[in-house]
Amino acid sequence: SRRKYLELYGVNKNLKKRKLLEKNFNIKFIEQKDKISKKNFFNFFNKNSFDYVINCLGIIKQKDKKFSKKEIVLINSRFPQIIDELSSHHKFKFIHFSTDCVFTGKKGNYSEKDFRDAKDLYGISKKNGEDLKKNNTLILRTSFIGHELFDNKSLLSWFLKTKQKNIQGYSKAFFSGLTNLE
């Protein structure tokens, strides 16, 4: 966070990216030398106290080819389940971001009660990441759009770098997501 009164914790093993983030944000890095495990996070939460934990970790659909199936399931499914479990034990509120990609899009006009019918690995991993006890958890199923810090694979990046005068798209679609500036 750029706001000094907010504590922001993160994990990033890339030293160059860490330095850039530390320079621009009030961030403290969690030393995560081992794999993501319930034991590692239980130890971390035993040493620290939080009112809220917001899960901003996820492997996005545009990058799922860079990661193994095991890594995608660990980050998008298992990690939120671990934090959800810890929220009950450590009495913090947990905010978890999910995606409309838990649906195939075939039906349209989905509601919260609709069957999550994802068929691809990304959608299924995010769907499983929503299977939480929800005692202290709020799941926000939304999309983000904005400039990326390090890659240019997002919709906005594609749109801004296209040389075409006209692009194909939808005329009656509604975007209900958030920008990464919010």
Regions found by a protein language model. Give the residues of each.
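SDR active-site strand-loop-helix element
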Residues: V11, V53-L57, F94-D100, T104, ...
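N-terminal Rossmann-fold cofactor-binding loop
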Residues: Y9-R18, K33-K35
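NAD(P)-dependent short-chain dehydrogenase/reductase
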Residues: D131-L181
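NAD(P)H-binding glycine-rich loop region in Rossmannoid oxidoreductase-like domains
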Residues: Q32-I75
